[in-house]
Every structure is written in C-alpha cells, then in structure tokens.
Amino acid sequence: MNPDLLDHTVAEIAAEMAQRPDRGAVASYIPELAGVDPQRFGLVVIDADGHVAAGGDADMPFSIQSISKVFTLTLALGLAGDRVWRRVGREPSGSAFNSIVQLERERGIPRNPFINAGAIAVTDLILSGHQPREALGEILRFMQFLAGDDSIVIDDAVAASEQRTGFRNAALANYMKSFGVLDNPVEYTLGVYFHHCAIAMSCRQLALAGRFLAHNGRNPSTGHNVVSTQRARRINALMLTCGHYDGSGEFAYRVGLPGKSGVGGGVLAVAPGKASIAVWSPGLDAAGNSHLGRIALEALTRRLGWSIFGV
C-alpha cells in the first residue's frame, strides 16, 4: 500500500466526517456514555507494512464496549477450543443485541458470541476455574499484549454505571443459568462482563490489537501467532455475519469487511491481508452501531478497493 495515498485518504475522510451534520445519537441507557461529545471522530488504519495512518481523535480513549467480545471469544477459543460452540451458536440473530425473547425460544443457547447473551456465556467460560479478578486481569493483559501497550485500562466509572443499570443483561444471565449454560455465579460472570466491556482504548490502540486478524492470526508487531490461520478466518467470518447485531447485513453490503461495533461508537474492521482499521464516532444509528463509523468505513473501502467482495 502506498503510504502517502493511505495518509491522504484517511485525512480526507476524517475532514469530511468533521463536516457532517448527521452524527447519530449517543447511547443514553448507560449514563457514563450519555455525556460523550458526539462531535468526536477518530480513524486509524495500520497497513500490512505497519504504516499507521491516523485522522481526527485517533489517540483519545473511548469505551470499546462490545468490541471486547472479539477478544474474549479469541481467548475462550484458546482455552476451550470447540467446546465454546456447545454454549453459543454461530448464526446471525436478526434481533436486538439484548433480546430475551430469542433466548427463551432457543432454550438458553445464544445465537452467536457477539450478542450480549453470547458474550456473557463466553465470559463465563473464561471465568471458570478463576476468581473474577483473575479472569478480568487475563482479559486486560491480553488486550495490552496485542496492542503492545500497558497503559490500556478499564474505566471503572463506566463499569459501575453498567452494573447499576444492567438489568436486562442480568435477566439474560439468569435465564441462561436456569438452562445450565452458565457454570459460575451470575453476579461473578456479569461483573467480569461489565468490566471487560468498559475497557478504554484509542483508535490507534484498537487497530494495533486487531492486527492479528488481518494477517492470518499472526501479530506482525511480534511475529508470533496469536491464533491459527483457520481460527482467524473463522473469527473474521463471525465478525462479518454477526458483528453489527441486526445491522450486520447492511454493514457487509455497504462496507464489505468483517467488523465489530460497540455502543461506545467504536468499530474494529479487518481488511484481510491489507489492514487493521479502527474508527470511533459516538453517535449511533437505530441498530446501535456507529453512524459515522459505518459511513467512514464505506468511503475507505470504496476509495481503496478493499471490500472482500471485490472492487
């Protein structure tokens, strides 16, 4: 990739997004997120050679929220392998990310690891055999290792805010517990879940952490394999089909990349073999995904010809 072209494209898109009046609405159901400035926008692209193109608020930390689910799934697969799929499916949900009705209909087995119920089940698997603090420490250290940055932390205020208001997540967890899907005390599993969703990262840190998914499971920064090639491809497949809740089809249609969103306004996207991409714009669309984040990524893939479906 020509680094000058990449720098120019990222700067151009960041400037365009700064001028757009349609910014979506910040997540209001988590009090700590409700006060985030909707004018913020950051974009970072790290290509296969390690060149970093950054625009806007690229180094401002934000709450990654559900983007953490990509990394907890990666950890859980490393710990338990295919046993993960006894607890959670691999199909798009077609429902809201916190739907209770679907969970009831399917006897406590979540559709995929990226909706809330699925991520809670994955968190429970990581927690097994550990104290909550140990499990959470393992998740945080994994994120720091991938990004090569020990300054990444959990925003305790956001975690506390989610714990105070996370009644629907508690309902999901208790429902799964009633079907034997969860092994650990619900309050322990939820505590770890709320805290890993409250990890704060910048676009630069997030793009660094996601590089292994763009390079067949290998972290180019260290040269070490994080996961196998097959596992990286399968995680990317789930990101493409399930990474944006019931907006996943629209994201695939418009952007054409595997991606995972969070209600903090972040999106981690993967251009296989080409780049790891992180974008942040706090305003959300009706499906709970970053409004300008999707528009920016669509512009990026169109201008660079990076859609996995061809130019």
UniProtKB/Swiss-Prot annotation:
Q: Which GO terms describe its biological process?
A: glutamate biosynthetic process; glutamine catabolic process
Checking InterPro entries in the record gives: Beta-lactam/transpept-like, Glutaminase
What broad class of enzyme is this? Answer: hydrolase
* Keyword hit for Hydrolase: yes
Q: Name one GO molecular function term.
A: glutaminase activity
EC number, UniProt record: 3.5.1.2
Binding site residues for substrate: S66, N116, E162, N169, Y193, Y245, V263
Keywords carried by this UniProt record? Hydrolase
Please describe the quaternary structure of this protein.
Answer: Homotetramer.
Can you say what this protein is called?
A: Glutaminase
- Which organism is this protein's natural source? Rhodopseudomonas palustris (strain HaA2)
